[in-house]
A protein has these predicted regions:
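Conserved lysine of the Walker
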Residues: 22
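Conserved catalytic-core segment of NTP-binding enzymes
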Residues: 104-208, 220-221
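The conserved Walker
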Residues: 18
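Phosphate-binding P-loop
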Residues: 2-9
Length: 231
């Protein structure tokens, strides 16, 4: 099921700073939607920040599971937008996932589609990893959120907790990360929580929010098996 994570939304925007796990969250949710069926699933990689982990690095995996992957190759440093976004957003038969860069630059790119990203059909998810440096205080996060959401001309959003230290994340890391999340946002609950799929069965009795199992798809070869605990 996907409704516990996105409700009735068909257009989902993913925003978050580098290291938040934004792309992994978007990729795993896209794969889940493809398994559920009922709608064609379109994934638009709009992250122009050239981070180490990008959705386009797992294009083959997405396509293999029936997700149509879209991105526009950059020419030098010129910002580009993949074609077909407006059509997909309007199409009732399509679920659309927009993976947007964490900076205002990437957010400006989707600002042109802001009129199509309104109402209950759209869900804006702001991914927070409380272990990342710029998640050190609520003020830091709110400054980033205001900057990014303002540039994208988006209003309401939901927080997603993604407490992780990379491939070596443990169950204790997740619960400690959720404690930190609670300190950052004492009056709010995350819409859902992300955790490595092998940890979810143990966490199910300790986490009250829906758990989205994460299978790492964008870990580069040099990091696999390295024992490093970072994204």
């Amino acid at each position: 099921m996907a409704e516990e994570f996105i409700g009735k939304a068909k257009n989902i925007v993913f925003i978050g700073e580098a290291g938040s796990g934004k792309t992994e969250t978007a990729v795993n949710l896209a794969l889940r939607l493809a398994r559920v069926g009922g709608r064609a699933v379109h994934f638009f990689d709009m992250d122009q920040t050239k981070p180490l982990f990008r959705a386009r690095d797992c294009e083959v995996e997405l396509e293999r599971h029936g997700v149509t992957f879209h991105f526009q190759a950059q020419y030098l440093d010129a910002p580009t937008v993949a074609p077909g976004i407006a059509e997909a957003l309007r199409d009732e038969g399509s679920a659309v996932l927009l993976d947007v860069g964490g900076g205002a630059h990437g957010s400006h790119m989707i600002g042109q589609f802001s009129q199509l990203l309104r109402g209950e059909e759209t869900l804006v998810l702001y991914i927070v990893n409380p272990y990342r440096p710029w998640s050190g205080s609520r003020e830091d996060i709110e400054i980033t959120m205001r900057r990014v959401l303002g540039a994208a001309r988006l209003g309401e959003f939901s927080l997603v907790a993604n407490p992780n230290l990379g491939p070596g994340t443990t169950e204790e890391d997740v619960t400690e990360g959720l404690r930190r999340f609670g300190e950052l946002f004492p009056d709010e609950h995350p819409r859902f929580v992300c955790a490595l799929e092998e940890l979810c069965s143990e966490l199910a009795g300790r986490v009250r929010e829906p758990l989205l199992p994460i299978r790492l798809n964008t870990v580069p070869e040099w990091l696999e098996g390295s024992g490093m605990r970072g994204e």
